[in-house]
Amino acid sequence: MEIFPAIDLKEGRCVRLYQGEFSKETVMNEDPVAQAIIFEKFGAKRLHIVDLDGAVAGESLNLSVIERICKAVRIPVQVGGGIRSLVAVEKLFSVGVDKVILGTAALYDKTFLEEAVLLYKEKIIVGIDAKNGFVATRGWLDVSEISYIDLAKQMEKIGVQTIVFTDISKDGTLAGPNIEQLELLQKSVAIRLIASGGVASIQDVKKLNDMNIYGVIIGKALYEKTIDLEEVVEVTKLC
């Protein structure tokens, strides 16, 4: 199983939100580049970065920070948030990003998504963020009328190989992942799944590993030290 430490960027800083609420932010590190270096030092093999400002604005607003992170670490970096054109995708790849996560665009601009998947294949990941089972977009500020299962099935038909699934109600809560929704997703599509939201303990990670989930994104649990990064990397190596 792949472990993805999370760095959420807002106004150039590393922050955590509670249940996706921008009004409930906590600054975890004023220097996201330093945070990325710390994660690499303690064994991270990959990083997951979200441009929160970009997700709301519809364009990358933390590109310079992302570029500095990519230059500072030697591990692959995947990035999401506000990526809604091929130009934006290409710009991220040009600064060293390994994989790009499309969210809002996957729901509202299928032509762009299809072109991106055709050009970049497995380098394009789709982020599906669910609120009460329905897909949320534009930085989680809007909730659509499409279920997360239906969108996942559409993504599979287009040729998307990996989905990041987030249950917004679990995000930043340390309440454990939404196993029920993940199991339903697994039964519905044959796509690699990266679980996000609520992971609080090594036991949570082991549970996801037992389900054959491809990867897990860990945020608050690392910052609040309810999960030790070195330990979780070692544990998942042995599984």
UniProtKB/Swiss-Prot annotation:
InterPro entries: Aldolase_TIM, His_biosynth, HisA_bact_arch, Isoase_HisA-like, Isoase_HisA-like_bact, RibuloseP-bd_barrel. GO terms for molecular function: 1-(5-phosphoribosyl)-5-[(5-phosphoribosylamino)methylideneamino]imidazole-4-carboxamide isomerase activity. GO terms for biological process: L-histidine biosynthetic process; L-tryptophan biosynthetic process. Pfam families: His_biosynth. Its EC number is 5.3.1.16. The active site is at 8 (proton acceptor), 129 (proton donor). The keyword Amino-acid biosynthesis applies. Pathway: Amino-acid biosynthesis; L-histidine biosynthesis; L-histidine from 5-phospho-alpha-D-ribose 1-diphosphate: step 4/9. GO terms for cellular component: cytoplasm. It catalyses: 1-(5-phospho-beta-D-ribosyl)-5-[(5-phospho-beta-D-ribosylamino)methylideneamino]imidazole-4-carboxamide = 5-[(5-phospho-1-deoxy-D-ribulos-1-ylimino)methylamino]-1-(5-phospho-beta-D-ribosyl)imidazole-4-carboxamide. Keywords: Amino-acid biosynthesis, Cytoplasm, Histidine biosynthesis, Isomerase. It is an enzyme of class 5 (isomerase). This is 1-(5-phosphoribosyl)-5-[(5-phosphoribosylamino)methylideneamino] imidazole-4-carboxamide isomerase. It comes from Bacillus anthracis.
